[in-house]
């Protein structure tokens, strides 16, 4: 009876987590996170892709927004007044505008709405349409010598049937129809408007109500009633 020669078992090589993490960066960031967890590399990938929603979803059960310093460090705003409130604001999603108005101190709101650092403004504008539009309108008002320094903002959005769309606070909602938010705002007298807008937006900067008319893919008209 012939003897069978057994081959020696190959030794299993366990790669360090850092090397695995480096290899996995070529995968989808969500899959990357599910394999190795929310590592620093994964966090940076998600934030580079402006994917805050999945960043928050992938955090462990023990996670609390008020203790997360990573996003502020990533943006370089750790010394800014908004820093302690940024991640809680992001975690509120559709209710972010309400949280901003009611839970953030007035002096912080004023700075964030009127004189934000460019990095912070760019980041918040990508997360929240209400913030993007508020900043665009505030800058327009100043260019037109209408001084505004609001501490609160509320936005009511209507379609051509005057139906209120209450999902405006979420960046992803309605974004396909609001491409024109990237164009400039121009003044227009209400008497010069010859047709109904495709979209009407009432912006409350404190108690000051400003109406905007949108005609898709063209421009935003700031209605002047003088």
UniProtKB/Swiss-Prot annotation:
GO terms for biological process, alphabetical: proteasome-mediated ubiquitin-dependent protein catabolic process
Domain (F-box) ranges: 9-58
Subcellular location: Host nucleus
TM spans (from-to): none
This protein's UniProt keywords: Host nucleus, Transcription, Transcription regulation, Ubl conjugation pathway
A GO cellular component entry from the record: host cell nucleus
Primary localization: host cell
Quaternary structure and partners: Interacts with host S-phase kinase-associated protein 1/SKP1.
Name of this chain's protein: Late expression factor 7
């Amino acid at each position: 009876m012939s003897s069978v020669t057994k081959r020696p078992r190959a030794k299993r090589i366990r790669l360090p987590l850092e090397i695995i993490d480096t290899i996995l960066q070529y995968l989808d960031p969500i899959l990357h996170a599910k394999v190795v967890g929310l590592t620093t590399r994964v966090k940076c990938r998600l934030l580079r892709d402006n994917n805050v929603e999945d960043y928050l979803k992938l955090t462990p059960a023990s996670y609390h927004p008020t203790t997360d310093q990573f996003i502020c460090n990533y943006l370089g705003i750790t010394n800014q007044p908004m820093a302690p409130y940024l991640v809680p604001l992001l975690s509120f999603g559709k209710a972010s505008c309400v949280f901003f108005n009611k839970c953030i101190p007035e002096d912080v709101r004023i700075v964030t709405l009127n004189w934000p650092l460019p990095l912070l403004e760019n980041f918040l504008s990508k997360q929240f349409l209400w913030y993007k539009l508020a900043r665009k309108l505030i800058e327009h008002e100043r260019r037109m010598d209408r001084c505004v320094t609001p501490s609160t903002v509320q936005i009511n959005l209507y379609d051509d049937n005057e139906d209120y769309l209450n999902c405006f606070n979420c960046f992803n909602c309605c974004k396909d129809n609001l491409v024109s938010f990237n164009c400039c705002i121009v003044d227009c007298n209400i008497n010069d408007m010859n047709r109904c807008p495709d979209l009407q937006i009432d912006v409350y900067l404190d108690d000051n109500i400003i109406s905007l008319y949108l005609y898709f893919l063209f421009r935003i008209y700031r209605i002047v009633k003088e």
